[in-house]
């Protein structure tokens, strides 16, 4: 094992002076974390402040909220502030707000009702700041508006209601589309596009000059319907017949929603349908839309084929409506991620460019691409990855971004000039740390957020001087003082090397009173999905994993291992799992467990694994290997067969069933011997109202195991009535975590020998499965 760090107390490089001394959360007191402090969510945690930067003539202005709820305009340059919205003008119970670009009005969302992961319904109101008047966006609204957004330059608001698009302007509303309904979505995504493609609730984009609106129309006609029953439906007395929610949910190889591209001239209300010919209609996914001009000359979309291993960037000239493929790529060695990173740059040496991230070289890096097509210009390179573009400053010709240059578990903030190609760190990039930043509208200032591994903080900087902060935004001094009362888990990060040569990142938590001469139970806590990352230098949440490490009756060591297929270690590392999800990932977890057992303190009779969602699937696949290393497992909301999951996620990694039938059969959890041979127990938890990973997965998995001969002393299935993927309905999470705590406690108490079995149970098992029950 190559030790990378222990709380990362690294030396300080001379190039960049750090904003403050490291403040490691080492505790120093005698208190141990308790269940109530950690579960179901961490109560001892860092605070962070989210600032709404304002795009005005003067850079460095942002909105903050006072203790009484008033909205304050802060000016960094003049160090002054002004109350824009008094506390008594703030609607009670509002959910969110957005300022008009000229700060003369505020758009409020109230009466929030959650729909899916990102989408919600609400009422919207417009507050005229000067007059103090509050006007409904739609006079007859009934908590049914799906999305609303200010134009970047004028008084217009685009909004979606009943899946139809509307334009509001100075109190006058124009309905743009008339065909919205259960199967037609204008300007908002359907379920699968929201969940798997955009990761957001809108599908409309104003041009920079506000004169045009690009939007997508989704047609779900013919997409199969999945029905979710709600047994209680938030009622005190359950209805005799459950409410049934019908969702158009395309599973693997089923019909996908089709998508159309539309342009709207806002002044004339003239709408144009732009033919999308990058791929056939039934083989098309639109992943991104971006304006490639400072006005409205050109707009582009990113098109994928159905299985997302081929990509075309198509530019549309707005006036002529002509389309042109300006870039394409073959990614059939794996898949192509939809990074949503296109941004217009403008003129560079007499030619117009846009910026994007691509991993075509094997590592994700920043490139300039000509707007009209042509040879790209690489701005970053190396065996590390750009994680995100934070800001493009066209005046200074700088792109700000975060990367893994120091190590795949870290994040540092840099700028790169697209004039000189010089890359400059904004932080000390010679130490293991996790940073991000939020830049002002014109790029002159930024909030630097240090997120770990030490106690997080936020500070304000000018881009002219990254060495000296202008002010502290969030110090978390109170958290640091609080932590001094505690004796905390000892966290370390290291790598283990596979026989094939790849290295896996590991995060280890040891009990606060760890004694290397004692034996400790261990719980592996993977997620492990494609492109994901669990092992990072971000703040170690004092959650359930920290609790089971701290409780004197439990004292578990936890290992989190990022297996092959996870993110930020290059395309080859990610793509290794293509067409066979769960195979290499499970091998890697087993290998890591065997490496763990080289430690004398690891109790080989009490090695568990627990995961949620993809992690629950990986838990089952790991136990399925029948390695004998793991003695118990817990799968929360798991996929059990990817033929039961949605098409746009699954086919990206597995292709269609027609192309990869054997791969799907092997990926499904289907072998039972590993479960039958467990020394301990296997627990499945799932919410019956899960609209993402359907309860069907848990039902099929438990049936497979029961029919395969897994006995009642080895298997428990726990459902949570009406709960979604997060298991939060009606205090379900409280029960869930108590069950988890009981499970790990019982497994620690379990002795290696088989518990006694009643004679009746022996006879029944023998009759059912033809087994000879041991005396």
UniProtKB/Swiss-Prot annotation:
PROSITE patterns in alphabetical order: PRO_ENDOPEP_SER
GO cellular component: extracellular region; plasma membrane
Residues of the active site: 613 (charge relay system), 690 (charge relay system), 725 (charge relay system)
Homology family: Belongs to the peptidase S9B family.
Protein name: Dipeptidyl peptidase 4
Keyword Hydrolase: yes
InterPro entries given in the database record: AB_hydrolase_fold, Pept_S9_AS, Peptidase_S9_cat, Peptidase_S9B_N, Serine_Prot_S9B/DPPIV
Localization annotation: Secreted
Species the sequence originates in: Trichophyton tonsurans
Enzyme class per UniProt: hydrolase
Catalytic activity from the UniProt record: Release of an N-terminal dipeptide, Xaa-Yaa-|-Zaa-, from a polypeptide, preferentially when Yaa is Pro, provided Zaa is neither Pro nor hydroxyproline
Lineage: Eukaryota, Fungi, Dikarya, Ascomycota, Pezizomycotina
GO BP, one annotated term: proteolysis
GO molecular function: aminopeptidase activity; dipeptidyl-peptidase activity; serine-type endopeptidase activity
This enzyme's EC code(s): 3.4.14.5
